[in-house]
């Protein structure tokens, strides 16, 4: 689905599923949501052919592996904690197309380190060698029949990773998942994505009740019903509706709560309004999905909107940075026609962390010279020379080297970057471009190399080793995003002592400090259909300003400032804990300050 940020049609309060315009109010970027809606009437019978009786509350297992035990130093610190179940369409490293996968890969271990029992539920897109068949199945109502799903499981870094096995997932994706999670090609969706992700939502609600998991040194058995479900992006929008209609109306999961996290507002799951019956939800939820926009796809006029339902039906709404939260409620353009809804519910922004073990210049096997903050300046110069040689640019450590790394799609602004390159060629500069995505953007980058072969290199293929090498060898990162909910690239750059010249949007505002860890270009237009000349000028002007600093004492200070930042998941996990505790789930207690289990082979234990 292409970005929705350019729509100029104002959604009416009726189209938003709110009965009266007077109900709108600003809940605040970090405010609690509005007063709870009236309780739903008694719902339909359970749609799952599994035991409908309340699951037993999980009990902490006898402690083992404490200091001097099974894992003497790297262990999860156990407390009563909370039972937290993350649900998402992606989960790194098993499946990933962007930041969503990284969050569901990195945040759960940090939550587990604080003593919470944590599960992540995601589709089984491939035959993952480390995930074992639990032999547990569930039959889920889909349309007029039932579909059988199986649950696969592995326990890694203190987290139960649960994979939903069904042909709708497994038979679609072969080899590297990449863009094939949502469709056969970038920008093309599978026609039955509603069925696929409805299945994910319903299966995820079963997992905590019916899976008896015993790998955790501190907890055993089912998670029980005192659970917080953390839904992620539009694919999990209906989960709160299924929780209320299929379970809570039958006395199950009575105290369970849901949080809904927006990773990218431009992908909302908009489908034909006539498709609502396929979700097998009571009519009372129709208004939460009801939506009118100005687009002709998938059909013109009235639609259902999965993200809108996810926002309205959740107990708490979050997103991945405070400034992005402010942008989402600022108006139609950046809120993509859901700004009114988010002003009603309130929204909390928490900046993401990153995997500091994968991205560590002191241990990185992909770079020529390893380094830390004390050796960064000289080591980065040596890595630059190695990078120049690798990509075929003139080897000269004195030439400022600017890198652009990102998915080649409208959000990341590769067209803006490409348009700015000619304005930079009068400078003594080298530019390395790395990314894959839409063919038109790949051609733009390759064209820049063809036009300026002595100054520009474009690599339009996936190359993880080169990405690490660029981080270590580049003097500056250029981030030309039209919008950026949080951003990972700038965090990786700071980890490697590479200041960022970035657009002033979303998480880039929260993480990059002008003159200390990077340079701000100002806000770029969110209209993805045109390249604004003013934006091109902002990019070129900022990069010219930045390269003049490279090689100076001020630049060396910026390198050090970048490398001393705490970019791990530890701080974000504590913020997430505070938000989830505020939901008041029975039995939930604050965690303690623990350390994550390192990603060592002995911890990668699959279910027997």
Swiss-Prot record:
EC code(s) of this entry: 2.4.1.242
Compartments, record wording: Plastid, Chloroplast; Plastid, Amyloplast
GO-annotated cellular components: amyloplast; chloroplast
Pfam families, sorted: Glyco_transf_5, Glycos_transf_1
Free-text tissue specificity from the UniProt record: Seed specific.
EC category: transferase
Chain residues that bind ADP-alpha-D-glucose: 96
Matching Gene3D superfamilies: Glycogen Phosphorylase B
InterPro entries in UniProt: Glyco_trans_1, GS/SS, Starch_synth_cat_dom
Residue range covered by the transit peptide: 1-77
Record-stated family: Belongs to the glycosyltransferase 1 family. Bacterial/plant glycogen synthase subfamily.
Designated name of the protein: Granule-bound starch synthase 1, chloroplastic/amyloplastic
Organism listed in the record: Sorghum bicolor
């Amino acid at each position: 689905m292409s970005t929705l940020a350019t729509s100029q049609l104002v959604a009416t309060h009726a189209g938003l599923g709110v009965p009266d315009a007077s109900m709108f109010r600003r809940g605040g970027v970090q405010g609690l949501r509005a007063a709870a809606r009236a309780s739903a009437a008694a719902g339909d019978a359970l749609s799952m052919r599994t035991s409908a009786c309340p699951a037993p509350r999980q009990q902490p297992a006898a402690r083992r592996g404490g200091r001097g035990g099974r894992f003497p130093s790297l262990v999860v610190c156990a407390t009563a904690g909370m039972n937290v179940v993350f649900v998402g369409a992606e989960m790194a490293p098993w499946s990933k197309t962007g930041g969503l996968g990284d969050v569901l890969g990195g945040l759960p271990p940090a939550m587990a380190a604080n003593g919470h029992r944590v599960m992540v539920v995601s589709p089984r897109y491939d035959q993952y060698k480390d995930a074992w068949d639990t032999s547990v199945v569930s039959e889920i109502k889909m349309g007029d029949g039932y579909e059988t799903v199986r649950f696969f499981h592995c326990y890694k870094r203190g987290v139960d990773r649960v994979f939903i096995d069904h042909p709708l997932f497994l038979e679609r994706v072969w080899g590297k998942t990449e863009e094939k999670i949502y469709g056969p090609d970038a920008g093309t969706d599978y026609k039955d994505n509603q069925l696929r992700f409805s299945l994910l939502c319903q299966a995820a609600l079963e997992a905590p009740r019916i899976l008896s998991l015993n790998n955790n040194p501190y907890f055993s058995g089912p998670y029980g019903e005192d659970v917080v479900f953390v839904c992620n992006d539009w694919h999990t929008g209906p989960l709160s509706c299924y929780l209320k209609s299929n379970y809570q109306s039958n006395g199950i999961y009575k105290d369970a709560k849901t949080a809904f996290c927006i990773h990218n507002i431009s992908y909302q799951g908009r489908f034909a309004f006539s498709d609502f019956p396929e979700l097998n939800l009571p009519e009372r939820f129709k208004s939460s999905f009801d939506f009118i926009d100005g687009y002709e796809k998938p059909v013109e006029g009235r639609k259902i909107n999965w993200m809108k339902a996810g926002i309205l039906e959740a107990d708490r709404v979050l997103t991945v940075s405070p400034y992005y939260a402010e942008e989402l409620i600022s108006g139609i353009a950046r809120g993509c026609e859901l700004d009114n809804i988010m002003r009603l519910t309130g929204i909390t922004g928490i900046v993401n962390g990153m995997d500091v073990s994968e991205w560590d210049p002191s241990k990185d096997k992909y770079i020529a010279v390893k380094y830390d903050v004390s050796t960064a300046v000289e080591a980065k110069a040596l890595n630059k020379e190695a990078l120049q040689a690798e990509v075929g640019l003139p080897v000269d450590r004195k030439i400022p080297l600017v890198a652009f790394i990102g998915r080649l799609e409208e959000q990341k602004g590769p067209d803006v970057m490409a348009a700015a390159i000619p304005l930079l060629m009068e400078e003594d500069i080298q530019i390395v471009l790395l990314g894959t995505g839409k063919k038109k953007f790949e051609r733009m980058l390759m064209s820049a190399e063809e036009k300026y072969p002595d100054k520009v290199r474009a690599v339009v293929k996936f190359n993880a080793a080169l990405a690490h090498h660029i981080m270590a060898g580049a003097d500056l990162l250029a981030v030309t995003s039209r919008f950026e909910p949080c951003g990972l690239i700038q965090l990786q750059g700071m980890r490697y002592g590479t200041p960022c010249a970035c657009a002033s949007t979303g998480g880039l505002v929260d993480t990059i400090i002008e003159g200390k860890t990077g340079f701000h270009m100002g806000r770029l237009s969110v209209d993805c259909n045109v390249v604004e000349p003013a934006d091109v000028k902002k990019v070129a002007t900022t990069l010219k300003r930045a390269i003049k600093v490279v090689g100076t004492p001020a630049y060396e200070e910026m390198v050090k400032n970048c490398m001393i930042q705490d970019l791990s998941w530890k701080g974000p996990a504590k913020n997430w804990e505070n938000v989830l505790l505020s939901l008041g789930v029975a039995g939930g207690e604050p965690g303690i300050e623990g350390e994550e289990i390192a990603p060592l082979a002995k911890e990668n234990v699959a279910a027997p």
